Structures are given as C-alpha cells and as structure tokens.
C-alpha cells in the first residue's frame, strides 16, 4: 500500500509529497527530483489529498 511522505527541498523551500511503500524509497524518489530534499513527516490519504501539493 502506498503511503504519502511530506518533504521540503532546502534549496528551493518547496514542499512536496512522495508516494512510496516506505520512507527509504521515498527518499530515493525525492532525490531524483530535488537537490536537497528533507523528510518532514508521513501524511494520511486525506491530508495528502487536501494539501494540494504536488505528489511524485
């Protein structure tokens, strides 16, 4: 089951969500799209949908 992980990119300040099975996989995906991604927290399905943030 895919979980939603909130990240912030230190280089740009952009917040974004990564959908992955675990936080380790989410970190790998985040690093493919952003220079300095930092994991913030895990979001529920509702929180991820309501946030309006881009999800990778």
Segments (PLM) and residue ranges:
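Acidic, low-complexity, intrinsically disordered interaction modules
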Residues: 14, 22-25, 29-33
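Short, mixed-charge low-complexity intrinsically disordered segments
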Residues: 31-56
């Amino acid at each position: 089951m895919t979980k939603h992980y909130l990240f912030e990119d230190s280089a740009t300040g952009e917040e974004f969500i990564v959908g992955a099975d675990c936080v380790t996989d989410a970190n790998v995906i985040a690093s493919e799209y952003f220079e300095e991604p930092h994991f913030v927290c895990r979001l529920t399905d509702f929180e991820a949908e309501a946030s309006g943030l881009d999800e990778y």
